[in-house]
Design a protein with these regions (language model features):
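Active-site cores of enzymes that catalyze phosphoryl transfer or operate on phosphate-rich substrates
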Residues: 1-4
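PLD/PLD-like phosphodiesterase catalytic module centered on the HKD motif
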Residues: 6, 10, 23, 35-156
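Secondary-structure "cap/kink" motif recognition
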Residues: 12, 16-22
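Short, glycine-rich nucleotide/cofactor-binding loops
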Residues: 26-33
Length: 156
């Protein structure tokens, strides 16, 4: 899919969130889209296991959805290694993988020239899930609750 022409978020991401029944693992540099936030909260309320990794760079921006997601009980870890976590990827129900240039923002939906691959393949989903959990485990658990300061190296 390509944005803004194809509306990659509303036609690609939202349907996958809405039909997920088991798990959603997201690595996203910046997430401000309210539709996605609401859909993720609905999915959590359906019992879907959701985990999100985001970067510290824009966490405190007014449109950032990190706090709303955390308040809804969705675990969000914040990576703080000076903008290092720049992925835009997600795995849904161990079957679908999104790899994209697209942050999940209004600008990515309506303004920016973006691309998004949605791959239905369990092997690729397994590899991306493994990478997600490698990153997840590398981030201290305290950053599920705190917003870290910038640093140039991994904190122990």
């Amino acid at each position: 899919l390509f944005s803004p022409v194809d509306r990659a978020i509303s036609k690609g991401v939202l349907p996958l969130i809405n039909k997920s029944g088991k798990s959603i693992y997201i690595s996203m540099f910046y997430l401000t889209n309210y539709w996605i936030t609401d859909a993720l909260i609905d999915a959590r309320n359906r019992g879907v296991d959701i985990k999100i990794i985001s970067d510290v760079t824009l966490t405190k921006e007014p449109k950032a959805q990190i706090f709303k997601l955390r308040e809804a009980g969705i675990p969000v870890k914040i990576e703080n290694w000076n903008g290092k976590m720049h992925q835009k990827s997600a795995v849904f129900d161990e079957e679908y993988t999104i790899i994209a240039s697209t942050n999940w923002t209004g600008a990515s939906e309506y303004a920016n020239d973006e691309n998004m691959l949605i791959i239905k393949n369990k092997d690729i989903a397994a590899k991306q899930t493994k990478e997600f959990f490698r990153l997840w485990k590398s981030i201290p658990d305290k950053f599920l609750y705190e917003i870290p300061n910038f640093t140039s190296k991994k904190l122990e």
